[in-house]
């Protein structure tokens, strides 16, 4: 009888401990984060692509939360190029899709939300997706920016080497 009366509280304590551990694990998730080195490598790859295609661009790389990790304007880029690249990167990250898709959605009237949510639905930015998870975005000031961003993603994250010019 005495053993049984001790087992009931011990079982209850063990159950509460297990439940607390399971709950704590449910409150945390792992998040992939683009590193400074990864963002710099993307900028370098995009710059190389732009030089091969005789373009002068600016580019911005954001992390999953929208924080600026890396930004660069090539010599001779327009005065507003950095702002344009940053706005495009923010838009691609918020909507989790290329800004060219957003542009089509807005132009056809399917969804006008990007126009009044301070987004910039102009072609030139892509979300950075690694293992199915959006870890950031890259915005490029040019209308060909998505090609440049894709080249950077391919070089840095897919390790396919230098992509050919379009």
Per-region residue spans from a language model:
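NTP-dependent nucleotidyl-transfer catalytic core
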Residues: 16
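Flexible, solvent-exposed loop/hinge segments and secondary-structure transition points
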Residues: 24-166
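N-terminal signal peptide c-region/cleavage motif recognized by signal peptidases
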Residues: 19-21
């Amino acid at each position: 009888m005495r053993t049984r009366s001790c087992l009931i509280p011990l079982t209850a304590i063990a159950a509460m401990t297990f439940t607390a551990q399971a709950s704590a694990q449910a409150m945390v998730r792992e998040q992939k984060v683009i590193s400074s080195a990864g963002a710099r490598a993307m900028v370098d790859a995009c710059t190389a692509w732009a030089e091969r295609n005789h373009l002068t661009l600016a580019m911005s790389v954001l992390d999953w939360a929208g924080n600026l990790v890396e930004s660069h304007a090539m010599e001779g880029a327009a005065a507003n190029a950095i702002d344009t690249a940053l706005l495009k990167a923010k838009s691609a990250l918020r909507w989790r899709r290329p800004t060219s898709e957003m542009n089509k959605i807005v132009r056809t009237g399917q969804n006008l939300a990007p126009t009044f949510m301070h987004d910039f639905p102009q072609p030139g930015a892509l979300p950075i997706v690694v293992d199915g998870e959006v870890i950031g975005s890259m915005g490029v000031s040019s209308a060909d920016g998505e090609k440049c961003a894709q080249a950077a993603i391919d070089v840095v994250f897919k390790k396919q080497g230098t992509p050919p010019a379009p």
